[in-house]
Each structure stands twice: as structure tokens, then as C-alpha cells.
Amino acid sequence: MRMSAGLSLLIPLWGRTFLLLLSVAVTQSRWPSEPSDAVRDWENQLEASMHSVLSDLHEAVPTVVGIPDGTAVVGRSFRVTIPTDLIASGGEIIKVSAAGKEALPSWLHWDPQSHTLEGLPLDTDKGVHYISVSAARLGANGSHVPQTSSVFSIEVYPEDHSEPQSVRAASPDPGEVVSSVCAADEPVTVLTVILDADLTKMIPKQRLDLLQRMQSFSEVELHNMKLVPVVNNRLFDMSAFMAGPGNAKKVIENGALLSWKLGCSLNQNSVPDIHGVEVPAREGAMSAQLGYPVVGWHIANKKPPLPKRIRRQIHATPTPVTAIGPPTTAIQEPPSRIVPTPTSPAIAPPTETMAPPVRDPVPGKPTVTIRTRGAIFQTPTLGPIQPTRVSEAGTTVPGHIRPTMTIPGYLEPTAVATPPTPTTKNPRVSXPTKKPRTPRPVPRVTTKAPITRLETASPPTRIRTTTSGLPRGEPNQRPELKNHIDRVDAWVGTYFEVKIPSDTFYDNEDTTTDKLKLTLKLREQQLVGVKSWVQFNSNSQLMYGLPDSSHVGKHEYFMHATDKGGLSAVDAFEIHVHRRPQGDRAPARFTAKFVGDPAPVVNDIHKKIALVKKLAFAFGDRNCSTITLQNITRGSIVVEWTNNTLPLEPCPKEQITGLSRRIAEDDGKPRAAFSNALEPDFKAMSIAVTGSGSCRHLQFVPVAPPKRVPSEAPPTEVPDRDPEKSSEDDVYLHTVIPAVVVAAILLIAGIIAMICYRKKRKGKLTLEDQATFIKKGVPIIFADELDDSKPPPSSSMPLILQEEKAPLPPPEYPNQSVPETTPLNQDTVGEYTPLRDEDPNAPPYQPPPPFTAPMEGKGSRPKNMTPYRSPPPYVPP
């Protein structure tokens, strides 16, 4: 009994001992063998706690590292393949979104089939975008339980980013890109197709599909094409040397520019075959395949972005200007500081932040590592001025403050002690309730206070403070030049305009450029005149102009940006005016005659620009750069221009005919649409369209009188030196001299005709002479024409010539019985005359012999010839 009771008491004791030994062994096995192991475990737990978002370490989602950061360029396609095998290895669901958000940025598209993230960013998408890729598994209750996640960044660069770098980053074949890269200073030839589309209304998939459909016409890869929206309604490029129309009659949407590279520094002779773009764009085949109307196309040379020039500051300003000193290499600290006062500092609340935009945003999750580029403000609050070191000797105040120049970031002023001046007093520290106040650059009259000199390049301006000796607020900082304008290209006779980008200047108080006041000036602080060929609208911040042939060359201008406090920054840039890209090879010249005097139009740049805009509107063009003004002459207002959209070769006869019928009738009278477009400022009288260049032998619209097209292009403007003299010379040259020449030719021709007529009529008889000598034969000799030297023979005896013999005696008639005294009349003689012949005894009749003397000529006559023939002698019976 006692034994059983002892066993019953030992069993619980052994059980407790066994449990104690077992717990000690387990504890010893889990405790680290060395102190270093314990420390290492503590560090691991600390590191895990730092990277954990939740309070419990076991509930945190593990982070997978392996997706590299990417870069994209505005207007170019972006594509990256996500290695899902690193994230989802067991069939989990992949979710891609912006870090800390539920959806992707508006320019990105995720394809779950190919595990590809692709898109096309616009100008509004610049900056750094953090993308989160997570894998989730479907839980028992139907919800998605996160398993793993990874975050990477995509930085979007602006459109003018270095092309080789951007292309090399996106191209799968680096060797192909390197072979097509142009030199640093060599222009890039780009072909641009203008589409009637709005990229802001497209989803990312539609933008990429548009680029893919364009591949059949461009024959280039996606990463080499660029698609950007139209900015400031500039559909066409003024620097284009080739252009063509599309099938769109008018533009409805904002417009999109789809371009790709053709080569380096090409011209019209070296441009490759573009019939694959020109013909489909005009006939509508391209529009049918792309799904959007095609407005037109053009080819231009784009100058690559050059390194930024050294800032040239104009120092003749009435406001304080920071003196340029050697760059400092001091470590940049956050712009918050402690005011050296024995009381609490005056720090503005975070809601009054006015800091320049920072490219790298702070990610939503603390597990993301941020790679900063440039100056980043760790504390985005508006703090007072940086502390300065002041050396005091006796009664001395802080003197000349000379800010130093730093590379990107904020200005960090340093202090320079001035010699002691016994006339000033030490500043006293004010009460901590005093709020800062921004000093004005204009001298202000206040109470007696110490004077602080601010050293500038311009004449020093005294800034008076109150007796407290501390500034009442953060001083106004001058605007900073962020991006240079550098260079503007213009062409003779072609209207140009340049919108100043909003990121050209930046001011800490007034922010971007559109909040600043811009002024265009010449070298010596001289404002641009009203009659200058370059004008600037400060309200819209638009620079525009219309150069002529006298402005060819390089011109330097200065853009001043002034903030509300009166401080300014300056950017120097150049305007290069080139000669007409087409020269004299334009296929047609349009000439219009308007009512009025040309002098006001020639001397007023605004009227010339208005004329060019109205002419472009009459042709249905929204871009004024399609019109190149050639000349404005007298004779009312005669305006001559060319159309830059016409191809040079071969002769675009159909296009010119279509443009001619759009503005003029067949007889040269302006159409109603053309007149309505230019009225009431310009009233058209007549229009002429003459072929030139490749169409020089054609006349499209008749002109009365026809005007011969000169071989050389006349100047764009009438010279202002002596317009009256030039007009008189034109009148003499085109009116007086031709009239005198024609009159002289007619006079000489009349004289020659008269001489020939007189010579032809010489030797011919008049009608009376012809009537007198009608019959040919022996002429009749009148009595006064006879030779009176010999007496005429007697009429009683017959005429016997000297060579003749004596006549025979008269015959005798023995049977005659009629007495001699019986008179016979003519009838009786006639009756009896034949009776004598019948006498058988009568001798035969013998006629007198002929003349023996020869006939000397037609006009000669025989000598001693009587004017009439004598009858035979009368022989009585």
C-alpha cells in the first residue's frame, strides 16, 4: 500500500523533471552559439523592420528585384517585356499599375498575353513614372492575396532629347543605329506626314496601332518613327524644301505629325524615292489604311540640338543683378535654414511652397529606391535666407553680399565682410513675432536704419531695411534661364512665327515663363521698332516676322524676362535669314493687282503679314508659310508670290490649274471667294498665273497685256531710297521706249514701200497714152513734123522717087466716045472703071515697085514722105 503510494508520488515528479530537461535542450539548440550570431540576427530583424510597410514582418509582401529601369522619349514608341517568371512562378495573377495607384499612367498599355508594357508618351507625360508589378493569388474567400511585388521607374525625356541615345535605348540592333547617326553639326532630313487626328483623344493602343499601320509606307521600324501633336496650329514647317498635298479638304481635329528620318543633310536632288508616300497621300490610299485623313506632307532639314551656350547676361539693368563669380563646389543643402536669432526661427508653413518643379517625384512606397538627378529639395517649404557669416569690428554691419554661381539648383549666397564704417550702427535683433518681408529693389524712404549695399554689375541700388536689421521676408530672386532659344531660322518672303516655350525661364515666385513679362530688345537695350521686320507680342509671347532680301544673314536679339518684383533675366539668340529655298525654280508665279498705293503696304510690316495671311486663306491653307512673297510693285498694288506646296519637277500642271481656278476666272478676273477673302483691306482687280521653272512655257491665266516673266527674281520689296524715280524708269522702260521703237519701224517700212512702188511704176504709160497708141504700125506724122528743107512736090504731077523710073504713059482707049467736057460724078466713074479693064487690048496692070530703103525702126519714117497717100493720077478718057 505504501509502495503504491510512493510510485504515485514519483510519477508526477519525474514528468516535471523530464519536461524541464526537454525545454532546456530545445532552448540551447535555438540559442546562437556565438555572440556574433546574435548580433547578425538582430541586424537582419532590424533591416526587415525598416523595409516593412506593415507592423508585422510575417505579413509583408516580399520584394523581387530584377526589372531594370527604363527610359522613353516624347513621341516615340516605348516597349518593355516584364519577366513574369521572376514574380509569378506558380500561376499567380499579374497586376501592373502606377506605384501607389490602381491604374497605369495614361500613356502606357499592358498586354497580359505577351507580358509587354508599351505606350507612346506626349509632352505632358515628361518626368519619372514609377511602375509597380505585383503577383496575387486568389484566396479562399475570393479576394486576391498579394504574393510578390517589384517597382521600377520609367523616365520620359523631352522630344528634343539626344536621338542616338534614345534610339539606342529602344533599338534591338545597336549596329543599325550607329550607321545612320548624323554628325554633331549635320542637319537631319525628316519626312513628316500631317494627319487630321487628335492624339490626346487616343488611348495608348490606338497610337501604337497608327505607327504600325504606317510601316507599309515608311518602311522603317517603330522606334525610328515619331508621332507628336500639332503645337500652336503649325501644321507645316517653314523650313521644308519639298511638300505635297493630301486628301483632306479641311482640318477638323488639332492635327498630328508623324515623321521619320530619311538621311543626313539631303536636298531635292539627293532625296530618295518618295512616290510611296506622295501618291498614296494625294489619292487617299494612305488615309484609307491609316484610318485618318491626310492633310499633306513635307520634307525638311532639322538641326540637331547643340550643347547649351554660356549664358550672356546684359548688365545694364536698373535692378540688382547677381555678380558672376567662380562656381562653388559646396555641398548643396536643403533650402531651409535657421535664422540667427536667439528666439525661435520664422519658417513659413508648407502650404506656401513655391519651388521649381522637380523631375523625380517621391514614390508612394518607402521600398522604392529613388535615383535623384539634379537638385532635389528634401523639405518642400519656403524658408528664410541662408545664414551668412558676419565679421563685426566695432560698429559694423554686414556689407556687400556677392552671390556665387552654381550649376543647376538654387543660388547659395556667400558673405563677404566689408571694412568697418563708424557711421553705421549694429543691427538689433527684433522680436520673434516679426514676419519676414521681401525687400524691393526700388529705394524706399523709411526710418533711420543701417544701410546694406548689394553689389551688382549695374549701378548699386541702396536697399533700406527697418531698424530691426533683419529682412522682413525672403528676398525676391531673379528669374533663371533654363532652356536657351538659341537659333531661329527664317526665309526671305516667308512668314514665320515662334512661340516662346514655357520652360525657357523659371522664377521661384512667378513660376513658368508664361507668368513672366517678356520683352524683345536689341543689343543696346533698345526696343524693337514698330516698323521692324521682327515683331513680338508680349501678351501671347509670340515672335513673328516677314524678312525680305535685304535681311539675309544673321541677326542677334535679346529676350528679357521680368518678374513682378522687377528683376529680369536675359537670353541671347540669333535669327538666321536664308534665301528662298526654291529660288527661281518655282513652277508658277501668281500675280494679283489690287486697288491702292503700294507704299503703305511695303512700309508696314503688319499690312504685309496681313496680306500674306489673306492670300493663304484664299487658297484654303491654314499655314501662312506656304506663301512666299516675291515682289510688291507699283501700278496700283501688284503683288507677286509663289506657292511652296507645289513640287518643282515635273511640272505640276494639274495642281497649278486647280489653284488658278480656285482664285481666278479664265479671263483673269478674280473669283468671288478670292475677293471675299482679301476684302475689305485689299480689293482685287485682276489675277495672272504664269508658269516658270519646269512650267515656264505655260500660261495658266491670261493677262492683258501679257507680261514677260523675268529670268531673275525681282526683289521682294520696292527700295525705299527713291521710289518715284524707279516708277518713272518703269514707265519709260515699258511704255515710252516700246512706242518709239514701233513708230520708227512703221516709218521705215512706209518709206521702203513707197520707194518700191515708185520704182515699179516707172516706164509705164498712163491711160491717155495707152489710148493714143492703141494700134501698132506706121505712125501718123503731122504737118509740123515734116522736114521743110525741101519743097513739097507739086500735086499736079505724081510723086516719083529718085530711085524710081518714069511712069508709063497713060493707056489709050480708042473706043471711048464720051467728050472730055462731060463731067463725071463718082457713081459714073465707078460704073465705067471696070469697063476699061475688060478691054482686051489694054496692058496688064503693073503695081508700083516697093520701097527699097530699109525700115530703120519702129519709130523711124521714110524721107520726104507725104502725110497721106496720093491718089493715082487722073487720066482723062
Curated annotation (Swiss-Prot):
Signal peptide boundaries: 1-29
Region (O-glycosylated at one site): 49-71
Amino acid composition bias (Low complexity), ranges on this chain: 413-433
Disulfide bonds: C182-C264, C651-C695
Keyword field contains Heme: no
SMART domains xref list: CADG
Compositionally skewed regions (Pro residues) per UniProt: 706-717, 841-852
GO MF entries: calcium ion binding; laminin binding
Start and end residues of each stretch annotated as Required for laminin recognition: 30-408
GO cellular component, one term: cytoskeleton
Highest taxon in the source lineage: Eukaryota
O-glycosylated at seven sites with GalNAc as annotated region, ranges: 446-468
Chain positions covered by the region annotation Required for interaction with CAV3: 801-877
Modified sites of kind Phosphothreonine: T772
Keywords, ordered alphabetically: Cell membrane, Cytoplasm, Cytoskeleton, Disulfide bond, Glycoprotein, Membrane, Nucleus, Phosphoprotein, Postsynaptic cell membrane, Secreted, Signal, Synapse, Transmembrane, Transmembrane helix
PTM section of the record: Autolytic cleavage produces the alpha and beta subunits. In cutaneous cells, as well as in certain pathological conditions, shedding of beta-dystroglycan can occur releasing a peptide of about 30 kDa.
GO BP annotation list: axon guidance; morphogenesis of an epithelium; muscle attachment; nerve development
Region (Disordered): 380-444, 458-480, 706-727, 805-877
Site positions for Cleavage: G635, S636, H697, L698
Keyword Mitochondrion: no
Locus of motif PPXY motif: 871-874
Chain positions covered by the region annotation Required for binding DMD and UTRN: 862-877
Reported function: The dystroglycan complex is involved in a number of processes including laminin and basement membrane assembly, sarcolemmal stability, cell survival, peripheral nerve myelination, nodal structure, cell migration, and epithelial polarization.
Protein name as catalogued: Dystroglycan 1
